[in-house]
């Protein structure tokens, strides 16, 4: 499906200053390098400014300072990237769901499904579940007993909600995600692992987004909780009893161990691992592949590990790391000799 809007309509939708003809038709979005006739682009990062003058885009979202001297058509806004985010939904070709329950879906007699909801082929909705207004449940989804899916929720095909999962409004969950699976809880009896029943649930706030193949485990006793506006990328593991504060974002392959609490407005980069039973305060940034082994009590950026370097250099560095203990001992001996000299003693013949 092709969407066509005029430059004037887009300017009105964004509250942007228009530079160019109102009637110019825009049929899609693209990068500065790839845009062609009829497409709108944006300049959000200065490193791409070199592509601005040569871009074939019909118009560009620009800051006022970047629009000065630009000969092409523009929509002038305070934040081009945010403006792009807002209008991207206008050109999204994703098919619209049709209200109703597909004949192949299996819905329990006592489940409540709003008449405006869309239930896809072969979906299963178990006893006591409640599906709110304008919810989309994709093909082959499983909605367990007593689950609640709030108004405007969108579940892609093959999403699994175990029993007693509570989802707020406008939540998006991508394919393969499993919400409410059993937490990893076992007690050791003389070398034998005894399973602990996970009798809590999962609660997701409003406007949460969960990526492909991400798992959010149910709590052992109380619920695992994901706050409002939280964004979880693909292949993330959220263990039982974890608490994630409002508007925190995590990139792919993050692993959060059980009972850890993460504050609001945090950014957790890809591949980060956190041990269990720690607290992370609000407004923390953790760089990629960092291993968080203790609580973080001060806002700011945190990192561990080493950045990429040429292989030969890395091998030399690794070899030096193995020598640190011996080097430390030699340094301590040297410090003792320096102390002897500075305190009035005489250096040895070896010094």
UniProtKB/Swiss-Prot annotation:
Domain of life from the UniProt record: Bacteria
Reaction(s) catalysed by this chain's protein: a UDP-3-O-[(3R)-3-hydroxyacyl]-alpha-D-glucosamine + a (3R)-hydroxyacyl-[ACP] = a UDP-2-N,3-O-bis[(3R)-3-hydroxyacyl]-alpha-D-glucosamine + holo-[ACP] + H(+)
GO BP: lipid A biosynthetic process
HAMAP family for this protein: LpxD
Pathway note: Bacterial outer membrane biogenesis; LPS lipid A biosynthesis
Active site: 240 (proton acceptor)
Pfam entry (one): Hexapep
Alphabetized GO MF terms: N-acyltransferase activity
Keyword Membrane included in the entry's annotation: no
Species whose genome carries this gene: Pseudomonas entomophila (strain L48)
Function statement: Catalyzes the N-acylation of UDP-3-O-acylglucosamine using 3-hydroxyacyl-ACP as the acyl donor. Is involved in the biosynthesis of lipid A, a phosphorylated glycolipid that anchors the lipopolysaccharide to the outer membrane of the cell.
Protein name per its UniProtKB record: UDP-3-O-acylglucosamine N-acyltransferase
Subunit and partners: Homotrimer.
Sequence similarity: Belongs to the transferase hexapeptide repeat family. LpxD subfamily.
């Amino acid at each position: 499906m092709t969407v066509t809007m005029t430059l004037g309509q887009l300017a009105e939708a964004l509250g942007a200053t228009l530079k160019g003809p109102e009637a110019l038709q825009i049929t899609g979005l693209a990068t500065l390098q790839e845009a062609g006739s009829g497409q709108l682009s944006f300049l959000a990062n200065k490193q791409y400014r070199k592509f601005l003058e040569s871009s074939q885009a019909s118009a560009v979202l620009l800051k006022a300072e970047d629009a000065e001297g630009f000969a092409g058509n523009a929509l002038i806004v305070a934040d081009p990237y945010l403006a792009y985010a807002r209008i991207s939904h206008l050109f999204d070709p994703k098919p619209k769901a049709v209200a109703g329950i597909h004949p192949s879906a299996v819905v329990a007699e006592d489940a409540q499904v709003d008449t405006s909801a869309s239930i896809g082929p072969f979906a299963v909705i178990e006893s006591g579940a409640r599906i709110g207004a304008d919810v989309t449940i994709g093909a082959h989804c499983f909605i367990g007993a007593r689950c609640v899916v709030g108004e405007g929720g969108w579940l892609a095909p093959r999403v699994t909600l175990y029993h007693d999962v509570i989802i707020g409004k406008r939540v998006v969950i991508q394919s393969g995600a499993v919400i409410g699976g059993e937490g990893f809880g076992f007690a050791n009896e003389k070398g034998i692992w005894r399973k602990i029943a996970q009798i809590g649930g999962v609660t997701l706030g409003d406007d949460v987004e969960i990526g492909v193949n991400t798992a959010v485990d149910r709590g052992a006793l109380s619920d695992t909780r994901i706050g409002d506006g939280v964004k979880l990328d693909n292949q993330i593991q959220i263990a039982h009893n974890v608490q994630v504060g409002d508007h925190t974002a995590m990139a792919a392959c993050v692993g959060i161990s059980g009972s850890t609490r993460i504050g609001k407005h945090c950014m957790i980069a890809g591949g980060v691992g956190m041990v269990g039973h720690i607290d992370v305060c609000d407004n923390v940034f953790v760089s990629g592949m960092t291993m968080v082994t203790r609580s973080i009590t001060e806002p700011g950026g945190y990192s561990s590990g080493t950045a990429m370097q040429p292989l030969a250099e890395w091998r030399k560095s690794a070899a030096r790391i193995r020598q640190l203990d011996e080097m430390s001992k030699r340094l301590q001996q040297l410090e003792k000799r320096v102390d002897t000299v500075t305190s009035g003693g005489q250096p040895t013949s070896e010094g």
